[in-house]
Amino acid sequence: MAKYVFFISTEPYKYQAVDTLIEIAKAALKKGHEISGIFFFGTGVYNLKKEISCGNSIRNIPEKIEKFSRENNIPVAGCSTWVSITGLKEHEFIEGASEEGLGDFSNWAIDADKLIVFGTGG
């Protein structure tokens, strides 16, 4: 079975990247594959902010990530440089998320069989 790592650099509500990521990851897990981690880069780190204001009629992306990662024991990390640039603090993150550098992400990617990237597209 394959080992997957996901990389996401899109904001929570601009695209459906997180929704798509979770559905792909669920399908991979169902087939017996492993998810080694989900790394948030650039403005994608905003996906990790637990106190995001989305109202009652919009899905809560950070909550979806937290629930999925907790239920499946998947590491979730935000790029330390981008966390600093955006002014986020690690205590503002969803439960289980951490702040990691690109070196840590590189180790995840090297150990993975598949790297799936969700970016802004261009």
Language-model features: locations:
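Extreme N-terminal starter segment of soluble prokaryotic enzymes
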Residues: M1-V5
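Ligand-binding beta-strand-loop-alpha-helix segment within the catalytic cores
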Residues: G78-T81, T86-L88, I94-A97
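C-terminal structural segments of small proteins and small subunits
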Residues: E92-I116
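A glycine-rich helix N-cap at a beta->alpha junction
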Residues: C54-W82
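Histidine-anchored nucleotide/phosphate-binding helix
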Residues: V18-H33, I38
